[in-house]
Every structure is written in structure tokens, then in C-alpha cells.
Amino acid sequence: MSNIDLIGMSNRDLIGMSNSELLTVEPLDLQFPFELKKQISCSLYLTNKTDNNVAFKVKTTNPKKYCVRPNTGVVLPRSTCEVLVTMQAQKEAPSDMQCKDKFLLQGVIASPGVTAKEVTPEMFSKEAGHRVEETKLRVTYVAPPRPPSPVHEGSEEGSSPRASVSDNGHGSEFSFERFIVDNKAGHQENTSEARALITKLTEEKQSAIQLNNRLQRELDQLRRESKKSQSGGIPFMYVLLVGLIGLILGYIMKRT
């Protein structure tokens, strides 16, 4: 069967040919998660429904675009064979994301003991009188899988890394808003504590200044009274009072 014959097949032909007697093919649609400049692979599974060896051959309308491994082979009785179809990296994406490429799987009963190396094109020749079973496969493009969401390091062990989703689908937004509110509340609490500490220190400093001023006034008054009452040396009580005032001032200044 030529490439022109493959293109001319309709969906009705596909439905009729999918009811195979020799090989069951899964899937009938080759789905490629299309990405530019990246090779993409898709697996075909061929299951032999008979008690005979079945030789197969895979053909495509666009052989330069796809690599099929193996493209020929033998499926043993009541067994399954995997065929890997790889689409070469594409430089441009189709405008409508539609693919017109098609594949054709041919199957024929083979002699007992035949190997994959012994499969020849003549085995699939209808002109030679061989009964060839054919299954047409379509190619479709699908969206590539999304990358997984990153897991936050701060999540607790055993808990889900994703935020719980409510009925309206906005659970992650609510969790994010709650996170912002909690951070603001903690920041405001820390700010309030800092303000209270600053206020307390300011009040203590003002009290120390007032006490210092009062002691200074009392010291000046004692000096004046001392000058009036005594003309000689410095009285012992005066020296004691000055020393006491110095100790008090030193203690206060150390606290502030």
C-alpha cells in the first residue's frame, strides 16, 4: 500500500480495519504532547490474538518525520510487543495544531520459528496471495503535561504541599491572603512592643533628668547656705552629701 492509499483512507475505513483478527493495537490514536525543538515518543502495543506467529510491519505517510523501532518484527502467540514511535524535533508548530500524518500497521501469519530478521517485504504482498491484515492509526497533538507545583520547604511533615481548594476553586488565594494577614499581625505586634519599650525608656530618662535637676538645685542651695554660715573649710556633711549625689547620678545614668 502506497502513501497515497494511506491518505485516501477515511474514518469509516479505520473503524472497519480496527476490528482485527490477528493483532490488537493500543492505542489507535498516536497522541504526541507537542513541544517545539523536542523529540517526542509514543508507544504502540501489539497483542497477538492467535496461536500462530504474526509478522508485522509499520508504515507512515511521513517517514522523514518519524522513527519507528522496531518497524518490522514478529509477535509470538498470545503475547504483546511494544513499538516505539518517535517524532523528530519540530521547528514550527502547525497553525491549527492538527496533524494529517497517518500510520498503517500490517500483520500476516508467519511460519513457526520465524525471527524478526527473517521478515521480508514480500510477506506483506497481496499480489503474492498473502492474507494481510491492516490497521490504520491516526496522529493527534495534545497539550504537554504541566510541571508539578514546587513544594514549600516550610510545609509540615505529612501535610499536603498544595493549599486546600474550596468549592469555588479559590482556596490557594485565601491561603495566600491569610498568610499576608498573619505576617502583618505579627509585624504590628512587634512594632507595638518596640513602641512600648521606647516609651518606657523615654519616661525613665525624663525622670532621671528631673531628679538630676532637683538634686542640682538642692546642691546649689546647700552651697549658698554653707557660704553664709561658714567662712572656713568645707563641712563634713557637705562632702558626704556631694558624694551621695554622685553615687545616685552614676546609678541613674547607668540604667539609661
UniProtKB/Swiss-Prot annotation:
It is found in: Endoplasmic reticulum membrane; Protein storage vacuole membrane. Its main location: endoplasmic reticulum. The modification N-acetylmethionine is found at residue 1. Keywords: Acetylation, Coiled coil, Endoplasmic reticulum, Host-virus interaction, Membrane, Phosphoprotein, Transmembrane, Transmembrane helix, Vacuole. It is a single-pass type IV membrane protein. InterPro entries: Ig-like_fold, MSP_dom, PapD-like_sf, VAP. The modification Phosphoserine is found at residue 149. The modification N-acetylserine is found at residue 2. One of its GO terms (biological process) is intracellular transport. One of its GO terms (cellular component) is protein storage vacuole membrane. Residues 157-169 have a biased composition (Polar residues). Residues 22-142 form the MSP domain. Gene3D superfamilies: Immunoglobulins. Residues 142-169 are annotated as: Disordered. Residues 187-232 form a coiled coil. Belongs to the VAMP-associated protein (VAP) (TC 9.B.17) family. Homodimer or homooligomer. Interacts with the cowpea mosaic virus (CPMV) NTP-binding protein (NTB). Interacts with NET3C. This is Vesicle-associated protein 1-1. The lineage of its organism: Eukaryota, Viridiplantae, Streptophyta, Embryophyta, Tracheophyta.
